[in-house]
């Protein structure tokens, strides 16, 4: 049985999603969701049920199955013969997969137990997007090594800023609960706020470097990468706006010691601009305008 999705106006590319692929995507989603249920159950357990805050050694192990199957399905969705497809649904799914992968890797070195209650549920929902919003057009110039490098770097930058945004949300909740004197049990496994803040700026610095490389390669090699000179579209404007926001934030941290709520607001503003730059433009073109 086949569920077909096509570009009705242009009819450029016919993309079919098989029942097998749908079931496999559901399996990935249920894998993430099942893990999320257990994580939230442990997170909301009364303090008396946990004598001391402990790490959950089983969580990274349990994450291997959905993470690996998710990677396989993304590979099949993106690489179709000699063509390369990366629609808005697949792009978001790749970003959340990279986000989970980075979190999974870092969890062996940092205490990030509280962050997993946000990352894993998001993966459960967004891993289904390649089925709901499949690509309808192949990307151009995908044979160029420079294009592939540009694409990989940009997706890594998005993933790091996604982690930074989730990190900021967790810090905001933690700060509010500390002031109220009512810190949830799962947040007691997190490092102190100052340690989390230092980690946040490390993440943002790494993302800023990758974003700089993405924008720089787009400017210098625009004609080779995209077949036309760089144009100041809303995608370009929002991309540079996010670069300015994150750059100003890092400069403010270095020069004036910015921290706390100021850093949180700047992080979310930069991430929102980045979402509008890439995901927003792809959504409008592919879903609304069907181009």
Language-model-detected regions and their locations in the chain:
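Cytoplasmic-side transmembrane-helix entry/capping segments in multi-pass membrane proteins
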Residues: 54-60, 89-90, 113-124, 263-268
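Membrane-interface helix-loop-helix modules in multi-pass inner-membrane proteins
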Residues: 69-118, 219-237
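N-terminal signal-anchor/start-transfer transmembrane helix
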Residues: 25-47
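Hydrophobic transmembrane alpha-helical segments in integral membrane proteins
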Residues: 17-32, 157-161, 288-289
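Interfacial loop-to-transmembrane junctions
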Residues: 251-273
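Transmembrane alpha-helical segments of integral membrane proteins
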Residues: 217-222, 243-257
